[in-house]
């Protein structure tokens, strides 16, 4: 059973002067910091459960980022430093005839003012294989209701550099001190008022894979202001494996406003050389909505799948169920 302990960060200096000693006052905090602390305290009083947990996660992330940012200069973190895309999620999934799988994921990106807002710190705990190869979130094992590989779930951290809106570089470590690097190019082409194509190419390096690449492309059509159809495909190959691993999703996404989303997806995935056209095929229904304010979201997934890992195994069938909570910070 996984337990979460809130991490409190207490900072302050207490100076006690002797008789005749000079007393040096600490620098006054910036007005923006005072307002932020006051607002956070008010939120914590109004919500004594979820808001303190969210503040603890965010404060811990900022504390780590301040330390890294101080390596590059004396500019205060409050002068442009901020957490973006912070997420902490707990997800439980199970497939028929398999043991349930509980996973905890954490991801955050923090902009560093001492690097002129061109670089950011990224850190988290996730499927390191998907992180290194830059798999689209919608095609992750979790979102396809596939059991996690515990050996691939690990902490990671590093620095990212945004050279251009379309070009980013990352260098970091995962699973202890295993280095990796990747470069991502992305571009979007509007094909009219209702259609759009998104392309993403990522080149990555690890000591085990050597050079590899992940290509992802999606086509979206806005059927109406609340209904979108999307076809998403991704494929990964490395110098070590020399075989494509691919996945695809064709789905309809109906928005009901206020972050309420209903989706129906047809999913398939495969591996070159497996002897079968697709190693996993399935249909999946998903509902997502806020459960507390606009930053704590819940989701429920139900799917039916037909896996076949290789040509020697008959295609079987299995129901799958997943439920999760995601906190944005």
Where are these regions (language model features)?
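Transmembrane beta-barrel domains of Gram-negative outer membranes and organellar outer membranes
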Residues: 34-165, 170, 318-319
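Outer-membrane beta-barrel domain signature
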Residues: 77, 93-99, 144-148, 170-176, ...
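Transmembrane beta-strand segments that form the barrel wall of outer-membrane beta-barrel proteins
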Residues: 86-94, 121, 155-175, 194-205, ...
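Residues that define the transmembrane beta-barrel architecture of outer-membrane proteins
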Residues: 100-104, 151-155, 177-181, 209-213, ...
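Outer-membrane beta-barrel architecture
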Residues: 107-109, 156-160, 184-186, 216-218, ...
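Outer-membrane beta-barrel channels and translocator barrels
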Residues: 113-115, 162-166, 190-194, 222-226, ...
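Intrinsically disordered, low-complexity segments enriched in Gly and acidic/Ser/Thr residues
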Residues: 238-296
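Outer-membrane beta-barrel "beta-signal"
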Residues: 301, 315-329
């Amino acid at each position: 059973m996984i337990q979460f302990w809130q991490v409190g960060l207490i900072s302050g200096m207490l100076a006690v002067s002797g008789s005749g000693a000079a007393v040096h006052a600490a620098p006054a905090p910036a007005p923006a910091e005072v307002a932020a602390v006051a607002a956070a305290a008010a939120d914590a009083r109004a919500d004594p459960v979820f808001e303190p947990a969210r503040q603890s996660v965010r404060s811990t992330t900022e504390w780590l980022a301040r330390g890294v940012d101080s390596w590059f200069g004396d500019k205060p973190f409050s002068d442009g430093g901020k957490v973006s895309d912070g997420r902490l999620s707990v997800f439980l999934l199970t497939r028929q005839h398999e043991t349930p799988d509980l996973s905890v994921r954490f991801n955050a990106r923090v902009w560093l003012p001492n690097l002129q807002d061109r670089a950011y710190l990224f850190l988290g705990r996730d499927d390191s294989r998907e992180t290194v190869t830059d798999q689209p979130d919608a095609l992750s094992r979790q979102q396809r209701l596939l059991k996690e590989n515990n050996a691939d779930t690990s902490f990671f951290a590093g620095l990212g550099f945004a050279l251009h809106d379309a070009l980013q570089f990352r260098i970091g470590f995962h699973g202890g001190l295993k280095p990796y690097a990747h470069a991502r190019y992305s571009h979007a082409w509007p094909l009219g008022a209702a259609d759009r194509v998104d392309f993403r190419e990522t080149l990555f390096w690890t000591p085990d894979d050597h050079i590899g690449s992940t290509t992802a492309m999606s086509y979206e059509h806005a059927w109406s202001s609340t209904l979108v159809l999307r076809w998403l495909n991704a494929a990964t190959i490395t110098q070590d494996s020399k075989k494509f691993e691919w996945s695809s999703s064709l789905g309809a996404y109906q928005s009901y406003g206020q972050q309420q989303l209903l989706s129906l997806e047809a999913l398939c995935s495969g591996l070159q050389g497996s002897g079968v056209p697709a190693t996993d095929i399935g249909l999946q229904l998903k509902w997502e909505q806020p459960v507390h304010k606009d930053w704590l979201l819940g989701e429920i997934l139900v799917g039916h799948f037909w896996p076949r890992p290789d040509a020697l195994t008959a295609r079987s069938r299995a129901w799958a169920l997943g439920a999760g909570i995601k906190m944005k910070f």
